[in-house]
């Protein structure tokens, strides 16, 4: 505006836009919050302009869609004052997500956190990403969120979700990247393990280096490795840890679909791949009890020719330090 231009020309320091200024302004927002396209058609880097009145924007081509400001916090972002906005973007149907938007003194959108492409990283089965707490430290965010559907929860939109999380995010110039996430589950606090650490366990099992592998597994699994696997003429080691096995992805075990006619449910990974699990049953290979909220599933690949489904996987007990504690393989364990 002219007033802003004159103030800056006279040497007044930059200041972050106030909540009142933002709540009644035309602003750039992430495309998924722009009221024009469905969330599935929008891109993470896409942008739209909307007009807020008393903190809410509506009236786009997406019927009943609206974007509502929930909170405004000031900070210094990349050397300049900035306002960090927590907003809920409701897509016009049953779903909506909380977004983070950062505006500089000129009310230009300079950064945003779009949770939609990263929901698996943020907790797996999340219908609506709901931020319950926001803290800002320069270009870093600390968020708390809930509404995470964990194993044992019912798997439909309106069901009660038992999981929540806290996470730190750092701006890398393109997006806010999660640097540490702690999930709060029925099993206690859980961090996902590093894939390299899980791979070390798999490599040790394949190499018959059981003394090394034992540091990452329960004793009952180690003693079962050279027993015959169910429905197989091979051992557990041969069936579930063949040479060349690589860890594809590890996820917090989510709420699962209803069982099919064979009693199997599908688990979805963030990379679009799937695995089968017999929900609710105790392991048949290692008697460590049934799967639990807070468990971690790691999908294994047998070769470079990946299909859309992990043929084998291993289940870990979640640990607060992200340590590896494997207790059973699958799907033969079902």
Task: Please tell me what each predicted stretch does.
Residues 76-88, 137-146:
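Acidic/hydrophobic-patterned starts of short beta strands in beta-sheet-rich repeat architectures
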Residues 90-94:
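Extended, low-complexity, turn-rich repeat/linker tracts enriched in Gly/Pro/Ser/Thr and Asp/Glu
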């Amino acid at each position: 505006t002219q007033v802003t231009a004159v103030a800056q020309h006279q040497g007044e320091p930059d200041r972050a836009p106030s909540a009142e200024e933002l709540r009644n302004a035309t602003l750039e927002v992430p495309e998924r919050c722009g009221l024009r396209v469905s969330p599935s058609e929008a891109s993470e880097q896409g942008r739209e302009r909307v007009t807020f009145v008393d903190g809410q924007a509506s009236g786009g081509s997406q019927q009943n869609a609206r974007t509502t400001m929930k909170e405004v916090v000031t900070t210094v972002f990349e050397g300049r004052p900035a306002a960090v906005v927590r907003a809920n973007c409701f897509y016009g149907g049953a779903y909506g997500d909380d977004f983070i938007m950062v505006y500089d003194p000129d009310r230009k959108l300079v950064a945003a956190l779009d949770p939609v492409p990263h929901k698996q990283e943020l907790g797996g089965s999340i219908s609506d990403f709901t931020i319950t707490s926001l803290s800002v430290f320069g270009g870093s965010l600390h968020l708390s969120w809930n509404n995470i559907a964990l194993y044992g929860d019912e798997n439909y939109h309106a069901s009660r979700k038992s999981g929540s999380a806290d996470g730190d995010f750092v701006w890398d110039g393109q997006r806010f990247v999660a640097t540490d996430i702690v999930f709060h589950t029925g099993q206690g606090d859980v961090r996902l393990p590093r894939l390299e650490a899980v791979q070390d366990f798999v490599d040790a099992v394949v190499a018959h280096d059981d003394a090394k592998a034992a540091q990452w597994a329960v004793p009952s699994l180690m003693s079962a490795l050279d027993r015959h696997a169910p429905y197989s003429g091979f051992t557990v080691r041969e069936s579930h840890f063949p040479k060349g096995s690589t860890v594809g992805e590890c996820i917090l075990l989510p709420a699962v679909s209803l069982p099919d006619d064979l009693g199997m449910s599908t688990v979805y990974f963030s990379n679009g791949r799937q695995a089968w699990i017999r929900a609710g049953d105790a392991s048949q290979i290692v008697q460590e009890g049934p799967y639990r909220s807070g468990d971690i599933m790691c999908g294994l690949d047998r070769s470079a020719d990946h299909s859309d489904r992990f043929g084998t996987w291993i289940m870990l007990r979640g640990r607060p330090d992200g340590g590896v504690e494997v207790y059973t393989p699958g799907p033969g364990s079902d």
